[in-house]
């Protein structure tokens, strides 16, 4: 999907740039070439198009792929040997909030063993707890994703990507 419209696709592009031993422009140019300058209509369409045979490979979220597999889709997950990112979803309590104690209780609730077990078993998410074992072995090495770098460089990366996908090159 278009990383200019999909946060997960943007993170995947930034992950490739960070983990692959090539210059940024080389990563972008090679990936655009491999895609044939075509992208799925949206993140949700990636697995549909792979399942239907429109594409042989798709980049998507682990949890989404696991849901498709459990629903019977004839696909499998392959993790990049270079590693992949796992950008945390956030939850925080705003200091001085009107209902600060309730907010703290909510955070305690969502990181509790019962909710984290539910997240693993029913939502296909990785737990934030060390004392909960995932249903299946979690595969793929997790790289140290530099979120600060990604935020700082996102606009430039997306501009280069859009130019490449339009056939105008990506700059240097």
Spans of model-derived segments:
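Short, hydrophobic alpha-helical packing/hinge segments within bilobed ligand-binding/sensory domains
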Residues: 46-47, 64-65, 103
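Substrate/cofactor-recognition hotspot
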Residues: 106
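Periplasmic-binding protein-like
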Residues: 1-5, 28-33, 39-40, 71-95, 109-132, 139
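An extracytoplasmic/periplasmic, membrane-proximal ligand-sensing/linker region
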Residues: 127-172
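A ligand-binding cleft/hinge motif common to bilobed small-molecule-binding domains
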Residues: 51, 55-74
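Extracytoplasmic ligand-binding site segments that recognize negatively charged/polar headgroups
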Residues: 1-54
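A bilobed periplasmic-binding-protein/Venus flytrap-type ligand-binding module shared by bacterial periplasmic
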Residues: 17-18, 88-99, 118
């Amino acid at each position: 999907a278009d990383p200019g419209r999909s946060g997960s696709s943007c993170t995947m592009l930034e992950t490739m740039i960070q983990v692959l031993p090539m210059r940024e422009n080389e990563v972008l140019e090679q990936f655009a070439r491999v895609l044939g300058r075509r992208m799925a209509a949206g993140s949700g369409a990636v697995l549909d198009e792979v399942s239907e045979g429109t594409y042989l490979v798709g980049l998507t979220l682990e949890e989404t792929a696991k849901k498709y597999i459990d629903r019977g889709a004839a696909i499998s997950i392959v993790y990049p040997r270079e590693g992949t990112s796992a950008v945390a979803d956030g939850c925080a309590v705003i200091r001085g909030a009107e209902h600060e104690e309730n907010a703290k209780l909510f955070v305690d609730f969502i990181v509790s063993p019962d909710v984290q077990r539910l997240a693993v078993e029913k939502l296909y998410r990785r737990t934030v707890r060390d004392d909960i074992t995932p249903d299946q072995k979690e595969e793929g090495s997790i790289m140290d994703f530099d979120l600060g770098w990604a935020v700082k460089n996102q606009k430039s990366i997306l501009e280069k990507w859009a130019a490449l996908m339009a056939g105008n090159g990506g700059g240097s």
